[in-house]
Amino acid sequence: MAPLEELRTGAWYGDRSLPLTFPPGWDVSTLNPDTPPPLSDSQIVQAFAHPVGQLPLRLLAAQKERPLVIVDDLTRPTPCARVMPFLLEEFRQAGIKPSDITVLMATGTHGLPRGDAMAKKIGSEAAAQCRLIAHDDTRDVVRVGRTSFGSPVYVNREVPASDLVVGIGGVYPQHSTGFGGGSKLALGVLGRRSITRLHYGHRSAGGSYDIENDFRRELDEIARIIGLHSLISLQVDAGRRPVRMATGDWERFYREEVAFAKQAYKAPFPIDADVVISNAYPIDVSLTFMRSKGVIPLVHAPTHASKVLISACSEGVGHHGLFPFISTSKLDRPRRAARSALARPGNVPQMVAGRIRRKLKTRTGRGSQPTGQAATFHEQRRSSSPIWLYLPEQVSLPDRIPGMEKVDSWPGILDRVAEDQAGRSTLKVVVYPCSPLQVLATDTVDNASLAPPELQDAD
């Protein structure tokens, strides 16, 4: 056996190295992202000193009395703790003590976080000094307006009660809006009614990485309505270390940050691989989020390929209020229709009509059909072979996970692959070391047409 360069696993729960070995005849290619070195202290200071389209935070915060800092939760890999000491210093320069700062964790519908989540996210020192609140989307929300799309905006009451709202978030591929980050941080502090309407009221970007969509436009409106004044945007490398930082007016810098992510994390489709390995780090905290964000390369694996998913699932199944793990495609349809009816009643006939059209096209063969490489990918997606789920740590998960089979050792994975491949000694192996961050793209295939329709939209 020859060792592969080490992967990472267990985001927020150890962030440890994971060495893997392969038989000598296997041709292993690891598709590492092209990211710059981790940020230095001086680079972080400079980012705070030169925000985009705004005064420095120390000036923006002058004369403020109730500042609020919104941070994403542990389902996102954003290392807020790396910049938190510098942020607190900006507030100190404005005459604001840490004890006067409220930190609100934007949990969306993900449920209440574990007791140590805030210390993991912002660092133990900041957690000990600041006032901490975990958002509850079913309580403590107030209505502050309505968007031009007709959605009522319910938000955590701490937001309108504050006189300066600063966010810390990241920029990651996202199924509904193309990319997360920017105004999408606001979604995490909204009430359940607003979140439901957003998810069921818009057509998903469908994994196309296109941020020019109505879901994103409405989020932009909502961020303005709730008063998201300033944003600290971080981009990470495959080891969850921050490598790029932008501060200031998110509307001014967001598209540039997305362009950077698309280029730095661009990776090819596994067109001719015999084995495709997808590492769900750094969004491997739970099964709920790993199953949608970590499987993209596997969805596009060739029919004959063995598919391996690596995920720590440190918090077990996890939770999403709109897209729970227990739902399956057929059982999920009435629930989706009901929620869509609550969000936008006019959507239900469109949903039914769309499903009928898709069934007719499938049965008659009519309608536009993909050609060339796109057709190849669509055919490959029909593979029925299971995904081998490698769990580096012992965690409690359901015995049955649709489409997956759990394997608790790496030698066990190699045995399954060898059996899959009928004992072939020479195999082409493609490894995606941080698949939730990686942007699958080619110069000839339309990403939107390759979006896996069966993916759950957990975000």
Regions found by a protein language model. Give the residues of each.
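N-terminal amphipathic/basic leader segments beginning at the initiator methionine
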Residues: 1-48
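N-terminal glycine-/serine-/threonine-rich phosphate-binding loop
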Residues: 30-62, 293, 410-412
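Glycine-rich phosphate/diphosphate-binding loops that line cofactor/substrate pockets in enzymes
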Residues: 52-68, 93-99, 267-274, 301-302, ...
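Short glycine-rich or small-residue beta-strand-to-loop segments that form or flank ligand, phosphate
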Residues: 66-77, 102-107, 276-279
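C-terminal non-catalytic interaction/assembly regions of soluble proteins
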Residues: 92, 292-459
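An acidic, phosphate/nucleotide-engaging active-site surface
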Residues: 113-179
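Internal metal/ion-chelating core segments
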Residues: 161-243
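Membrane-embedded hairpin module used as a gating/binding unit in multi-pass transport
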Residues: 209-285
